[in-house]
Amino acid sequence: MTVQTSKNPQVDIAEDNAFFPSEYSLSQYTSPVSDLDGVDYPKPYRGKHKILVIAADERYLPTDNGKLFSTGNHPIETLLPLYHLHAAGFEFEVATISGLMTKFEYWAMPHKDEKVMPFFEQHKSLFRNPKKLADVVASLNADSEYAAIFVPGGHGTLIGLPESQDVAAALQWAIKNDRFVISLCHGPAAFLALRHGDNPLNGYSICAFPDAADKQTPEIGYMPGHLTWYFGEELKKMGMNIINDDITGRVHKDRKLLTGDSPFAANALGKLAAQEMLAAYAG
């Protein structure tokens, strides 16, 4: 006998009118163990360059019916790329717009993963005690030790980051100083911070989570309502080209901009980023 799981969003009792994804959607799109593999970097980087992670610091995303989606950064999209980069020799720092702790979608945490969970525990303090992004931006110059900026996905990236002048300044610094920018799924929504000023990403191609897929997720209770705007439409308006219209785990490199389409791309993006950064900094 097959037990049917509910497609109704689950109540988040920590906030009024807030909801987690339905049991059904979690059964389809999350797993207690990740697909981490291919972590093989026999000649890791030994220098001072590191990664700046720009993380989400807000949990609740309003939808079109007034209900709140309980979100944050997706753990797989955050931790798998970082696992590869760390294994390749690159340490990382975490910053949020407010300087307050990173919010994670804990309902997507691979809690039985014997590699990812110890890695998360080892670095949890960085996410709990991030730097304030404005302070990081104020210190940036051509000699700064950040080799890359990494913006993880999760719908939490839609909150605050697309309007942040500090996010814009960090991205402008990275592109103009020949650093890497790494992102996946909803993370590229942060690139919208560039739309009202100098936009060095104009003309770049990326993979990202398709707007069409976001429009379907309320049907299975992943979100409690529809989004009030769609980041893919807005990225196209600012001159970016989204090369995927589905979710296949695809990754893409355009110069030093490295992107993936979804959590299914997290492992491949980690491999790509580690290989590209080793070639640039340890070659």
Swiss-Prot record:
This is Protein/nucleic acid deglycase HchA. Its main location: cytoplasm. It is found in: Cytoplasm. Belongs to the peptidase C56 family. HchA subfamily. Gene3D superfamilies: 3.40.50.880. The gene is hchA. Keywords: Cytoplasm, DNA damage, DNA repair, Hydrolase, Metal-binding, Stress response, Zinc. NCBIfam families: PRK04155.1. InterPro entries: Class_I_gatase-like, HchA, Prot/Nucl_acid_deglycase. Its EC number is 3.1.2.-, 3.5.1.-, 3.5.1.124. It comes from the Bacteria. Zn(2+) binds at H86, E91, H123.
